[in-house]
């Protein structure tokens, strides 16, 4: 029973970490990364589809992304989706190839992104601690109901704290790496 609760805690914390990592990956750094376009949805074929399902996206150089559209009829819809995404890319079209240019970032933009990164990181750490607290509350209720002993509660608490520390370390490491990437000109 305790192992199930510990596994639940670990799963919930890892899901939170996964969401955090995808949020951090979406923060633009001034360098071309194909993953920046992952969230773009295109209105085509009578519905909404992700950009990467109707084209291939590659990095040409540090400042340029190439979007090779598989069906030339979708170029207009893709251009509209990119403009509506407000990512600030400059672009040019050459047939079925859309060339996206990543604009240079000012120092103020970089500092604001670091602040945003710090807020996202702190929110994630708070979520992780809340998960830990919820799990510990469940364990205390179980101990009050005499389902587990006080020793089991203490041991489980130490193990859950260890999991919490590991996840928070990953958050801190990711924050520091992304901060360095953002501030590097």
Curated annotation (Swiss-Prot):
Any one biological process term the GO annotation gives: translational termination
Disulfide partners: none
Cytoplasm recorded as keyword: yes
CDD domains, A to Z: RRF
GO CC term (a single one): cytoplasm
Keyword set, alphabetical order: Cytoplasm, Protein biosynthesis
InterPro entries for this protein: Ribosome_recyc_fac (IPR002661), Ribosome_recyc_fac_dom (IPR023584), RRF_sf (IPR036191)
Subcellular location: Cytoplasm
Gene Ontology MF: a single term: ribosomal large subunit binding
Keyword presence, Membrane: no
Principal location: cytoplasm
Any Pfam family matching the protein: RRF
PANTHER family documented for this protein: MITOCHONDRIAL RIBOSOME RECYCLING FACTOR PSEUDO 1, RIBOSOME RECYCLING FACTOR
HAMAP family registered for this protein in UniProt: RRF (MF_00040)
Protein family per UniProt: Belongs to the RRF family.
NCBIfam families: frr (TIGR00496)
Function: Responsible for the release of ribosomes from messenger RNA at the termination of protein biosynthesis. May increase the efficiency of translation by recycling ribosomes from one round of translation to another.
Name of the featured protein: Ribosome-recycling factor
Taxonomic lineage from the root: Bacteria, Pseudomonadati, Pseudomonadota, Alphaproteobacteria, Rickettsiales
């Amino acid at each position: 029973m305790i192992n199930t609760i510990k596994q639940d805690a670990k799963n919930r914390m890892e899901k939170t970490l996964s969401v955090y990592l995808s949020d951090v990956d979406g923060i633009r750094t001034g360098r071309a990364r194909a993953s920046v376009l992952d969230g773009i949805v295109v209105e085509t074929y009578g519905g909404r589809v992700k950009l990467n399902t109707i084209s291939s996206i590659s990095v040409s150089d540090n400042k340029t992304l190439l979007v090779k559209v598989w069906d030339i009829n979708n170029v207009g819809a893709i251009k509209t989706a990119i403009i509506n995404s407000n990512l600030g890319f400059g672009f040019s079209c050459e047939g079925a190839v859309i060339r996206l240019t990543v604009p240079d970032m000012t120092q103020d933009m970089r500092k604001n992104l670091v602040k945003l990164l710090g807020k996202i990181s702190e929110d994630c750490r708070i979520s992780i601690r809340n998960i830990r607290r919820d799990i510990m509350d469940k364990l205390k209720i179980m101990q009050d109901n005499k389902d587990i002993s006080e020793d089991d509660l203490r041991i489980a608490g130490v193990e859950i704290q260890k999991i919490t520390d590991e996840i928070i370390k990953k958050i801190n490491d990711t924050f520091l790496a992304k901060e360095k990437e953002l501030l590097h000109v």
